[in-house]
Design a protein with these regions (language model features):
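A contiguous loop/helix-start segment that scaffolds small-molecule binding in enzyme catalytic cores
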Residues: 2-5, 78-83, 96, 139, ...
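Short hydrophobic/aromatic-enriched beta-strand-loop microsegments
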Residues: 50-57, 108-112, 131-138, 185-194
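Class I SAM-dependent methyltransferase SAM-binding "motif I" and its flanking Rossmann-like core
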Residues: 14, 88-161, 204-207, 253, ...
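Short beta-strand/turn micro-motifs composed of small residues
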Residues: 34, 87, 115, 144, ...
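Class I S-adenosyl-L-methionine
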Residues: 1-15, 20-114, 214, 219, ...
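Short, acidic/turn-prone active-site loops that include or flank metal/cofactor-
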Residues: 12, 37-39, 55-62, 117-119, ...
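Short, glycine/charged-enriched secondary-structure capping and boundary segments
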Residues: 21-23, 46-49, 68-69, 98-102, ...
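Phosphate- and divalent-cation-binding pockets in alpha/beta enzyme and binding domains
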Residues: 41-42, 95, 121-122, 176-177
Length: 264
């Protein structure tokens, strides 16, 4: 008898943003296969005896290849087990959920997709940036700044895709990405923001114009989301989230920085 695999989106970082359906299937799973960006606290929802498989990918470290992950999901499903594949954000937004679903479908293993809150909308929201706003932004596009294998994305054909651009996986190429967007036609003076570790106590927001970010020496650690467009200008008025985590050794709360000014 075949089991079932749940492809569950874990949300952008705060474990409380997991959906009720996601929590429900986690609490009765036999196996949880989790990514690096899935909040570690969510593993505590799984039964104590559940198998936990680390499938995380980080710079210079890959616990399991995508092919190995697919094999684990198919193998456990064929054994009749309930499996949760726990992914940061949403499984179908740059999460390779489609690849895993195809592998399961091809093997005849039942699966269910449990959507999650994607950083593509949550990161801007936690920085006080609406991706659409009447009179400012009638459209938004979500783009990966980095392709498979770490190759840079071709931003020339996507730079004008929408009023608001949301670029995921941009942390390690921030200056290059901003420079490419300007070269592709985005206004150098357009408001832009980088949101790192969105929704967590370590959240950091850096604001400026595209040109300022392109010329700055600011560094952010992944996961980070770059947002650019007219509605980013609302961040100063709509900022609502106050991270509580202190900067190591300073006792100062992590906050928002402007690349041309001091912390607010």
């Amino acid at each position: 008898m075949s089991g079932i695999v749940y492809l569950v989106g874990a949300g952008p970082g705060d474990p409380r943003l997991l959906t009720l359906r996601g929590a429900e299937v986690l609490q009765r799973t036999d196996v949880v296969v989790y990514d690096r960006l899935a909040p570690a606290a969510l593993l505590d929802l799984a039964p104590r005896g559940a198998e936990r498989v680390d499938a995380g990918k980080a710079r210079g470290r890959v616990a399991l290849s995508q092919e190995e992950i697919n094999r684990v999901l198919v193998d456990r499903g064929r054994r009749g087990l309930t499996v949760v594949r726990l992914k940061g954000g949403d499984p179908f937004v740059f999460g390779r959920g489609g690849e895993e679903a195809l592998a399961l479908a091809g093997a005849g293993v039942p699966f269910e997709v449990v959507p999650g809150v994607s950083a593509a909308v949550a990161a801007p929201a936690y920085a006080g940036i609406p991706v659409t706003h009447r009179g400012l932004a009638a459209s938004y596009a979500v783009i990966s700044a980095t392709l498979a294998g770490g190759a840079p994305a071709d931003l020339a054909r996507t730079a004008a895709a929408a009023d608001t651009l949301v670029l995921l996986m941009a942390a390690e190429r921030l200056r290059e990405v901003c420079t490419q967007l300007i070269a592709a036609g985005r206004p150098p003076g357009e408001p832009a923001a980088v949101v790192a570790s969105a929704s967590t106590g370590a959240q950091r927001v850096v604001t400026g114009t595209l040109a300022e970010l392109a010329a700055s020496e600011v560094e952010v650690d992944p996961p980070a989301t770059l947002v650019t467009g007219p509605s980013v200008a609302l961040a100063g008025s709509l900022a609502w989230f106050a991270p509580a985590a202190p900067v190591a050794g300073t006792g100062t709360a992590v906050g928002e920085n402007q690349v041309t000014g001091s912390a607010r």
